Amino acid sequence: MKTRSTSYSPPMAGLAILLALALLAAGCTQPAADGHAQTLKITGSTTVLPVAQAAADAFMKDHLNANIQVTGGGSSVGVQAVGEGIAEIGMSSRDLKPEERAKYRDLVDVAIANDGIAIIVHPSNRVPSLTMAQIKEIYAGNTTNWKDVGGPDMTIVVVGRDSASGTREFFSESVMKKQDFTPTQLEKNSNGAVKQTIAQTPGAIGYVGLGYIDADIRPVPINVNNALVEPTIANVVAKTYPIARPLIMITNGAPEGLAKTYLDYLLSPAGQAIVAEEGFVPITA
């Protein structure tokens, strides 16, 4: 799988959302260099970003008049940017919230891939597996040493995502069952930043999308009824991996023009091949 880039995680997620939207809006007035290119702005989830960027690169090779700009910022940024007309397509690694649908009544979402959320640790940590209950207790701050879950005698450093993250929202619902995260959690603004922290911190635990797994970190199998289930594409397809979710694209109303052509490409066999190449699960699998 490909190595993902990392980025700094600011302490104030709300400020980060506003800044991301301001920067995106500032780019809306820039004319195309040749006067003919069509610009498509896509923003949001850092989980979906690698797929969207790779698809955009391939798409633009065959559509020379297309200028597709893909940026991250988190799922909440993607939803808000589309709802307020700052971007044509939003990326999200979670379902739309009821309050978002109420605020932006014309939002339309389409699943473009499936994904699993891998629990990751430093490569030196050989904890054999974790149950869903153990993961919840760690992230709630009730389990603080790896020896209590079959690992080394070492303090657990909890690493998660900031409040703009769709991955965090899904993790909160599917793993935490809405229980509060420990206040000592280190909050990062991207999958890449989580991965980098885990790779540099022997006692750390984190969670990332399947496409971010590489040799720098170690994915931990999840113990499901005494069966150890690895975070793999095959197990997501088989529906045996317990932390899985769809990845979606969002438009304000039914997609039209370049946005529709791009989304049609992403859902085509060529686009779904890119989904697989980036380490995610094709929607048709």
Q: How should these model regions be labeled?
A:
Residues M1-D34:
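Secretory targeting signatures
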